[in-house]
Design a protein with these regions (language model features):
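PLP-dependent amino-acid enzyme catalytic core
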Residues: 3-6, 13-15, 20-520
Length: 520
């Protein structure tokens, strides 16, 4: 394939049509640019053997004409178009099957899949939680099993795929729901014992399916994520799996098959704004994303560099504000206090997907990536170069808020606009208020809403002045009576489901749990 011209930030853009399949799109490791694989191999492997993350060799371009055409399509057809650009080794029929199996009215309560709500003054809420587990992770994890099985069939036929997941709450349940009873797969989810909401824990520990397992660890999400990465890159363990015709893969956002579907909803959102006459094609928008592992906002960055006219990427953090500090100073330092907050899915100090962004911003210099992330592993910190700092500041704004400010934002949204949001969305609301006050920027803005408020019922109820008493199900009923927002059946039905998984282990025992589960 002819290599496209470089774009700013180190990313290159490929101007081939999304409707044509070619042999062009390969994926390379952020730590070894010479390691190149097909999209099917990248999705099956999850992570490169050198510990790097797979990124596309180039980004497919969306022209203004493409965006105008996408505005006339529904969500599934927009997804088909985007995937056809990234997954060039898949057939059109395979992509259509994956898309139609994921984005339908059996899995999502809205036929629009993602709901775009106009709040006030050119500010919109993108609700990504109308899927089966009431969190934005469904947007990717309803399609990932189909992408993975199609990939495995092509790259490792006959192998059983073992999915390992570290979760701070939402990914675990969404992955379990997506992979339950999928032939040829097993899935094991690790979560921090005291680092998820009661509703998130209940969702995971009651999960049905013959091929699923869930285990708590005594530690935080970073411990779980580090443990899973260590297991993935253990060559001796990989050899044992190979002897048993098994192969590890990931459902975390380190897997490109998780990230690509997230790019879709940013492209679709802009197309929807154009379709509804809220913006004219080419008008800029800002995007505000509450994030801990950086995957959700990275997807917006990729959409921007494909051609979606996103002006500012606003990164919203809770008290674990390592990303805020990094965007403002260029210093990433996880040597700090870890806080358990009311927005637990963002209680993260090691943001894995930042590696992909830095690979783009440093001109795809894999040696620099290896140096920075080697330093992070050894010392817990690194500092990027001045050129990368400048690019960060040009594209991103970082802000954070504490729990009291989060609850105040929930209350203000409810009182002013009769809009009930969850704790993570409230972090984004508060950070956007700070950004707008600080900059005076009135560009139309989309705030990403990542979870149903009922997933964090106690905190939301307390925020709007309700009485926090009884169990979580009584609080759901109280929240429903106060807000009028229907309780999702997926959450209300948990009350009568039996707990299947109650195991809790030290973080050092994670590999033992995996070996026991697999009978190795």
């Amino acid at each position: 394939m002819k290599r496209p011209a470089r774009r700013r930030g180190g990313l290159s853009k490929d101007h081939s049509s999304g409707g044509e399949w070619s042999s062009g799109m390969l994926y390379k490791s952020t730590r070894n640019s010479g390691c190149k694989v097909t999209s099917a191999a990248a999705i099956t492997q999850g992570i490169s053997a050198d510990g790097g993350l797979f990124v596309p060799e180039s980004l497919p371009a969306l022209s203004p004409a493409d965006m105008t055409r996408l505005a006339g399509l529904g969500y599934a057809d927009r997804a088909y178009d985007v995937f056809s650009r990234f997954l060039t080794d898949f057939t059109p029929e395979e992509i259509r099957h994956c898309v139609d199996s994921a984005y339908n009215d059996r899995n999502f309560e809205s036929d629009r899949i993602a709901e775009l709500v106009h709040l006030y003054d050119g500010t919109y809420m993108l609700e990504l939680w109308h899927g089966p587990t009431c969190a934005f992770k469904d947007m990717a994890l309803q399609i990932l099993p189909h992408l993975l099985m199609a990939s495995a069939k092509r790259t490792v036929p006959g192998k059983e795929i073992v999915i390992l997941v570290a979760t701070s709450g939402d990914t675990g349940k969404a992955a379990l729901e997506g992979f339950k009873d999928v032939p040829g797969t097993r899935i094991l989810v690790f979560y921090p014992e005291d680092g998820v909401s009661p509703m998130q824990k209940r969702q995971m520990t009651t999960q049905d399916g013959a091929n699923v397992a869930v285990c708590a660890i005594k530690g935080n999400f970073d411990d779980a994520q580090t443990g899973v990465k260590r297991i993935f890159t253990d060559s001796a363990l990989a050899a044992r799996l190979a002897d048993a015709d098994m192969l590890f893969s990931s459902a975390n956002s380190i897997n490109w098959g998780r990230l690509a579907p997230q790019i879709v909803y940013y492209i679709s959102t802009y197309a929807e704004l154009v379709k509804n006459g809220e913006v004219r094609q080419g008008d800029p928008i800002n995007v505000v994303v509450p994030t801990g592992n950086f995957g959700n906002i990275l997807a917006a960055y990729y959409a921007k560099h494909m051609g979606v006219p996103i002006a500012k990427l606003i990164c919203a953090s809770n008290a674990n504000n390592v990303l805020t500090d990094f965007i403002r100073t260029g210093v990433y330092d996880r040597n700090r206090s870890f806080y358990t907050t009311v927005s637990p899915s963002m209680d993260i100090l090691i943001s894995s997907n930042l590696e992909r962004l830095l690979y783009a911003l440093c001109g795809e210099d894999d040696a620099r990536i290896a140096d920075w992330f080697g330093s992070l592993s050894k010392t817990g910190r690194y500092e990027v170069t001045d050129d990368v700092k400048a690019k960060l500041a040009a594209e991103f704004y970082g802000g954070f808020c504490d729990d009291d400010q989060t609850k105040a934002a929930i209350r203000a949204m409810f009182d002013k606009y009769s809009y009930l949001c969850d704790t993570h969305t409230a972090v984004a609301v508060k950070v956007y208020e700070d950004y707008r006050r600080e900059t005076g920027d009135t560009t139309k803005t989309v705030i990403v809403s990542t979870a149903s408020p009922y997933k964090f019922g106690a905190s939301v109820l307390e925020a709007i002045g309700g009485s926090v008493s009884g169990d979580e199900y009584e609080m759901l009923d109280t929240l429903n009576s106060r807000s009028g927002l229907p309780v999702p059946e997926a959450l209300a039905g948990l009350k009568t489901k039996p707990v299947r998984f109650a195991q809790s282990v030290e973080k050092q025992q994670m590999q033992d749990v995996v070996l026991h589960l697999l009978g190795l």
